[in-house]
Structures are given as structure tokens and as C-alpha cells.
Amino acid sequence: MLLKKIRPHLFYALATLTAALPAAASAQTLKSGDVAVLASYYEIRGSDCLALRAPRLSLTMMPRLGKASVMQTRGQSSDSGRCAYQTVPVSQLVYQADQAGSDTLAWEVKYQNKTLGTRRYSATVVVTPGP
């Protein structure tokens, strides 16, 4: 009986904790010469759906086999939730694959929202020889 009462709360606590943990390293495969957006970030104040300035994105570990750059653009928020499809300023991490091999890069994202704070991410890009 006690387990039935606790289970929904335990599930909610675990889901919240999982959402708060930093993202694990991700992997993507590209061909030499390809250009890809590895990550895009925006920030919306949820209470009134106000689009805030794009989060500050900075590279903390540069790739060895390709080039990475930070681009500022405008885009749309996700397609779900109360603030869906809002036009927002976006920071993007763009990677250009040069040499074949496994390349790793890392970056951090600084949000205006103190709860989100600064988040750190990394990615491994596998580059295969181009055509």
C-alpha cells in the first residue's frame, strides 16, 4: 500500500533529477567536407513566452580534425508546450568536417535564467572519407 502511494512521487523525482543532469557526450557521423549544426540553443521566459537573447555559447575544447564555429541566427522554438513556434534568437554550434577520423569538441552554454545557469556539453564526430 505504501509503495503504491510513493511510486508516482518517486517516478516524478527521478524524472526531474534526470532532466537536471548534464547531457552525455553525443556522437555524429559526417563525411569529409560536410558542414553540420551540432547544437542549437534558445531561451524563452515561460511565464509570458518572451524570447530572451540567445544563450552565450563558447567552445571549451576545439576540434583537431575539423573546424567549429558559433553562429547567431533566428529560429523557432520547439513544436510543443505553451510557447511553441515562437520566433527566437538562436546560438548554434556549427562543425565543418575536414579530415577523416574521430574528432571531439566541448562547449558551454550560459543562460540568463539562474536556474539553468551554465551547462557543459561535448560531442564526438566520426568523419569518414568524402566522395
Residue ranges and their predicted role:
Residues 108-112:
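Beta-strand-rich extracellular modules
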Residues 1-7:
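N-terminal secretory signal peptides that target proteins for export/translocation
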Residues 25-62, 114-131:
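Extracellular interdomain linkers/hinges and stalk-like, low-complexity segments
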